[in-house]
Amino acid sequence: IKGLSEGYDTIIGERGVGLSGGQKQRIALARALAVKPGILVMDDTTSAVDMETEKYIQAQLRQLPYDCTKLIIAQRISSVKDADLILILKDGVVTERGTHQELLRQRGYYYETYCLQNGITPDTAPQEVM
């Protein structure tokens, strides 16, 4: 917001300044957090930001100064790896559940996705992945 020509007074929209996908996501998240919700549902909230920005956002979400249950729907493993509980759904059915480490040890869909997103061949993954 500070980088926009008029800061908080900048008009956004069809006749206003265009925002990138990542900027839209960050502003939407900031608006959601401004009301200090008890429950926050985030659907691919960081899909359009770079990895460094995602790390920063995740760190800030962990340090919220109020109680907030966070439900994170994501494609990126990096978005959910620090969650207390991760659920993998297929056709509306939970097929895997656990922490990041537990799901890696199961060597199921989560593990395969982790390997794919991190450039690791599942069959030759080093033991430290587990």
Feature map (PLM): residue ranges:
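Catalytic Walker B motif of ABC-type/P-loop ATPase nucleotide-binding domains
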Residues: 40-43
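Short loop immediately C-terminal to the Walker-B catalytic DE motif
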Residues: 46-47
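Conserved catalytic loops of ABC-family nucleotide-binding domains
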Residues: 63-74, 80
